[in-house]
From Swiss-Prot:
Compositionally biased residues, Polar residues: 148-171
Domain SCAN box: 45-127
Annotated keywords: Activator, Differentiation, DNA-binding, Isopeptide bond, Meiosis, Metal-binding, Nucleus, Repeat, Spermatogenesis, Transcription, Transcription regulation, Ubl conjugation, Zinc, Zinc-finger
The keyword Ribosomal protein appears for this protein: no
Protein name (record): Zinc finger and SCAN domain-containing protein 21
SMART domains for this protein: SCAN, ZnF_C2H2
Similarity section: Belongs to the krueppel C2H2-type zinc-finger protein family.
Described function: Strong transcriptional activator. Plays an important role in spermatogenesis; essential for the progression of meiotic prophase I in spermatocytes.
Molecular-function GO term, any one: DNA-binding transcription factor activity, RNA polymerase II-specific
Locations listed in the record: Nucleus
GO CC term, one of those recorded: nucleus
Amino acid sequence: MMTKVLGMAPVLGPRPPQEQVGPLMVKVEEKEEKGKYLPSLEMFRQRFRQFGYHDTPGPREALSQLRVLCCEWLRPEIHTKEQILELLVLEQFLTILPQELQAWVQEHCPESAEEAVTLLEDLERELDEPGHQVSTPPNEQKPVWEKISSSGTAKESPSSMQPQPLETSHNYESWGPLYIQESGEEQEFAQDPRKVRDCRLSTQHEESADEQKGSEAEGLKEDIISVIIANKPEASLERQCVNLENEKGTKPPLQEAGSKKGRESVPTKPTPGERRYICAECGKAFSNSSNLTKHRRTHTGEKPYVCTKCGKAFSHSSNLTLHYRTHLVDRPYDCKCGKAFGQSSDLLKHQRMHTEEAPYQCKDCGKAFSGKGSLIRHYRIHTGEKPYQCNECGKSFSQHAGLSSHQRLHTGEKPYKCKECGKAFNHSSNFNKHHRIHTGEKPYWCHHCGKTFCSKSNLSKHQRVHTGEGEAP
């Protein structure tokens, strides 16, 4: 189980004595304070994982409550199976990481296991480079080892888990660019010399405690780097130590908070949506490193996702998921439209498309529709009305979508591009058919012989063998 909450709550100071009216009031305030900053998804996950049998009167109630908590966390009504699987894999992946890396990755709030892996790979590359510096999330520019030290180990007492005010320590000066991003309050101190003087006076009584924290932070820094090096057999431990020594000797110390030069050395906080990661091949920019890593595969041709059944490789995990369905041959639940499913629940969900209430009925053929607009568009088939005309060649269409698709023949526009091979298409249906070549997906299933097809037209041709209308292709 993950020992930390994804994301960091804002740093809070100690409560004034006058707020602590009574034990009950203190308890309520702490609950509200925690609930305010916990991400909802992580809060539901913790409720599910920390639920105890003693909280319910009996086994049936316990099972029922667990189901409710699980649904609140995984949200099956809005998440797909792949998204739910990714949440579970991400949780387990963070659990098996070494403690030092686990805390660091959680601070970056990865949304998927793939993004967590990309963060670790980026960290390895940064540690391999001379004069490296560990990147931190935009909202909290704090040293990695300082974060781990402040956010705690598994055996901390409850009192130590309370948020503490940020302390300025001279121990961070020796780390060069790995410094703390100034918050709004600290920037006010930097602009007002009187506040800087008051701040220094208030921290002089805690110098011994700061020195102890600094030594602990140094030890944790060495721990997280040693974990990375230990998992890289090609890296030399001696070479890494030399790099660390050179770094300590050459990096300029952090200037005082009150000096103008010190304020200029602090990196500016990235603006939301800023695209700082640029592809060296084509110049395309991305807002995070994981998207850049995925994009690079279009240039390198790398396909890290391999099917364990047939060995076929893919550049994206989503394509592997689609392909893997082709090996799940057992699809006993089929629909009249030709699609087949491995579970009856999936078939029922699909059949709702056919059994939806359709109050608008065509007088000519009896076909029903759920919306009036759909009936009007359908009725043009019988009347032959084609109100949408192409200005280039004069060809007319019964639907606006047909005109838009046709006009791309004149403009040459092909907005639907395949990520695997780069081929582009002017219509989404053509793109979907082409994409099945890469994934191997064959969703159309013959209920007579079990043969599968990638398109409905191929299934219709094949079924003529069983009906006696013609030969199979």
